[in-house]
Amino acid sequence: MYGNNNKKSINITSMFQNLIPEGSDIFSRRCIWVNGPVIVGAGPSGLAVAAGLKREGVPFIILERANCIASLWQNRTYDRLKLHLPKQFCQLPNYPFPDEFPEYPTKFQFIQYLESYAANFDINPKFNETVQSAKYDETFGLWRVKTISNMGQLGSCEFEYICRWIVVATGENAEKVVPDFEGLEDFGGDVLHAGDYKSGGRYQGKKVLVVGCGNSGMEVSLDLYNHGANPSMVVRSAVHVLPREIFGKSTFELGVTMMKYMPVWLADKTILFLARIILGNTDKYGLKRPKIGPLELKNKEGKTPVLDIGALPKIRSGKIKIVPGIIKFGKGKVELIDGRVLEIDSVILATGYRSNVPSWLKDNDFFSDDGIPKNPFPNGWKGEAGLYAVGFTRKGLFGASLDAMSVAHDIANRWKEESKQQKKTAAARHRRCISHF
């Protein structure tokens, strides 16, 4: 038996089962009926939807390719990481952070919080189960979700989940972005994506090139310096660097508050004026600002400003060097667009992540080619034919939580309405279905 909340489940798919003719290939794999939604992904977004459904008494199942919840946080983040925003903007619905947690919890505290969240709502994902494809079957009006489950020493097993609703909760950061630099294969030194970076201890005394100047690139560069390395950070394009706090108040919170009372352009001008007072002119350190303000840039393009947590003073003093774009790599060196050639020992690619939705969600017009819903926040959580999305707002955990509540509420209403049309008895199961939920 698979799934959660089984005691409360009501079979609302019996009418579809009765309509399916004998011999239909809808049961070509080991098949599992799900009487509620299938949630793909057990990160914060998937957990938030699951908790909302639990509160509504709606059965569901979560499929997670990793062996744990929040695998991005557990397996692909560096040790010194802390939340960049105050905890009240990062908590999931209906479950605040513990009072004793600091304003900016550590990575390990956040993982602890998520594990407590899952335990509190009795959320039990199916781990080590990778979705190969999900496709809406127009003939039967159902979703067909095909997976491969890694069962350890028992090998792997293929399943097909049949459901009325599917929630895509794999998020914006499912796959690493690894640029194809000329000559990188001949470099000969250590090359690592920031997702595999844990600590700068192994780089003591080494010259390290950090490619990327977002929050990860800045923080990795600072961590490298603190561990005795000599970091150089590649900055190809304009970037907004802001203080994490302005006069003791979170910059993010200040921006949110200002936008309630003034237009975005004025809020941007105010924040940039205050940032210049605190940080100085970042242009002269090689960190040129974009032409449009940080709040407008975030709203239009989803680009997050860098919140400085200590890297900028090291950049000012030259302890973290800023270098321009890359032309190509060579044996133990890199050639830059300004003509300089740097000798380096290691490369860390702080080049970010992307959605992997296009690789498995088939025949849909809801997501763009880059795996993000075409409709921007706050209208990007609901598609057609029972398709939902959470974690693609480009507004972090706060935006994901808002979408999760909308999704859970909408599915619960539809599930309850369909439940009324069914007899509240155990429904007949198709003879070829190996399990029922």
Curated annotation (Swiss-Prot):
Source domain of life is Eukaryota
Q: Which InterPro entries match?
A: Auxin_biosynth/cation_transpt (IPR050982), FAD/NAD-bd_sf (IPR036188), Flavin_mOase-like (IPR020946)
Which residues does FAD bind?
A: 41-46
Going by the record, the broad EC class of this enzyme is: oxidoreductase
**Pathway linked to the protein:** Plant hormone metabolism; auxin biosynthesis
Q: Please give the start and end residues of each transmembrane region.
A: none
EC number assigned by the record: 1.14.13.168
The record's Gene3D superfamilies line, in alphabetical order, gives: FAD/NAD(P)-binding domain
Amino-acid positions noted as binding NADP(+) in the UniProt annotation, renumbered to this chain:
212-217
The record's listing under Pfam families reads: FMO-like
Q: Name one GO molecular function term.
A: NADP binding
| Alphabetical UniProt keywords | Auxin biosynthesis, FAD, Flavoprotein, Monooxygenase, NADP, Oxidoreductase
Q: Name one GO biological process term.
A: response to ethylene
Does this entry carry the keyword Flavoprotein? Answer: yes
Which cofactor(s) does the record list? FAD
Catalytic activity of the protein: indole-3-pyruvate + NADPH + O2 + H(+) = (indol-3-yl)acetate + CO2 + NADP(+) + H2O
Name the PANTHER family on file. FLAVIN-BINDING MONOOXYGENASE-LIKE PROTEIN (AFU_ORTHOLOGUE AFUA_4G09220), INDOLE-3-PYRUVATE MONOOXYGENASE YUCCA3-RELATED
Protein purpose: Involved in auxin biosynthesis. Belongs to the set of redundant YUCCA genes probably responsible for auxin biosynthesis in roots.
**Family assignment from sequence similarity:** Belongs to the FMO family.
UniProt protein name: Probable indole-3-pyruvate monooxygenase YUCCA3
Organism listed in the record: Arabidopsis thaliana
The uppermost taxa in this organism's lineage are: Eukaryota, Viridiplantae, Streptophyta, Embryophyta, Tracheophyta
Which gene is the coding source of this polypeptide chain? YUC3
